[in-house]
């Protein structure tokens, strides 16, 4: 396999082939356990470096909980601050949906796995509502099930470190 991130995901057990029943009840010939990658320091470090390289952004953000380790890894690799998009706002302490000052900043949104793009769209809208400029999303794995198109409709591009078709073809 040529894609070094795909190789790392396979080696750490984040991608398995076989017969699986997904949460939706659908059957799949592969399973993505991205937590096997994001809880592995060596793999997470490489993911962070790969995302940070050659991109222009002032801040990185991830939607809780899955994308937060990725946002931290990108922050450490780039030296730029990170923000967290909560799934639900809170009404005590520092209330709100966003942890971090994103107002007026060019924010790179990261995701662990994209399918239809629901989580990425939620993060995109929440960040924009908080005054951030967001036009790019980077995901570790894209299942190629509509996320790219959904984000494009909102004026954001999606870059995948690994596309499922690469894994199935390779």
Curated annotation (Swiss-Prot):
Catalytic activity: orotidine 5'-phosphate + diphosphate = orotate + 5-phospho-alpha-D-ribose 1-diphosphate
Pfam families named in the record: Pribosyltran
Enzyme class label: transferase
Residues bound to orotate: 115, 143
Transmembrane helix found in the keyword field: no
Gene Ontology biological process terms from the UniProt entry: 'de novo' UMP biosynthetic process; pyrimidine nucleobase biosynthetic process
Regions that span the bilayer: none
Binding site for 5-phospho-alpha-D-ribose 1-diphosphate: 86-87, 90, 92, 111-119
Keyword Glycosyltransferase attributed: yes
The protein's annotated pathway: Pyrimidine metabolism; UMP biosynthesis via de novo pathway; UMP from orotate: step 1/2
CDD domains (alphabetical): PRTases_typeI (cd06223)
Assembly and interaction partners: Homodimer.
NCBIfam families reported in the protein's UniProt record: pyrE
Family (UniProt): Belongs to the purine/pyrimidine phosphoribosyltransferase family. PyrE subfamily.
PANTHER family: OROTATE PHOSPHORIBOSYLTRANSFERASE (PTHR19278), URIDINE 5'-MONOPHOSPHATE SYNTHASE (PTHR19278:SF9)
Role according to the record: Catalyzes the transfer of a ribosyl phosphate group from 5-phosphoribose 1-diphosphate to orotate, leading to the formation of orotidine monophosphate (OMP).
Protein name as it appears in the record: Orotate phosphoribosyltransferase
Species of provenance: Methanoculleus marisnigri (strain ATCC 35101 / DSM 1498 / JR1)
Lineage start: Archaea, Methanobacteriati, Methanobacteriota, Stenosarchaea group, Methanomicrobia
């Amino acid at each position: 396999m040529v894609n070094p991130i795909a190789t790392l995901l396979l080696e750490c057990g984040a991608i398995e082939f076989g017969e699986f029943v997904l949460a939706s009840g659908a059957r799949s010939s592969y399973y993505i356990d991205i937590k096997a990658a994001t809880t592995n320091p060596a793999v997470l470090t490489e993911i962070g470096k790969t995302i940070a390289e050659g991109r222009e952004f002032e801040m990185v953000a991830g939607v809780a909980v899955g994308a937060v380790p990725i946002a931290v890894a990108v922050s450490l690799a780039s030296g730029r601050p990170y923000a967290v998009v909560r799934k639900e706002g809170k009404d005590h302490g520092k209330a709100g949906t966003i942890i971090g000052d994103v107002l007026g900043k060019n924010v790179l949104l990261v995701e662990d796995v994209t399918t239809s793009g629901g989580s990425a769209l939620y993060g995109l809208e929440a960040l924009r509502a908080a005054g951030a400029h967001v036009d790019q999303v980077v995901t570790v794995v894209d299942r190629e099930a509509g996320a790219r198109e959904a984000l494009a409709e909102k004026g954001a591009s999606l870059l995948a470190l690994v596309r499922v078709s690469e894994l199935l073809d390779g």
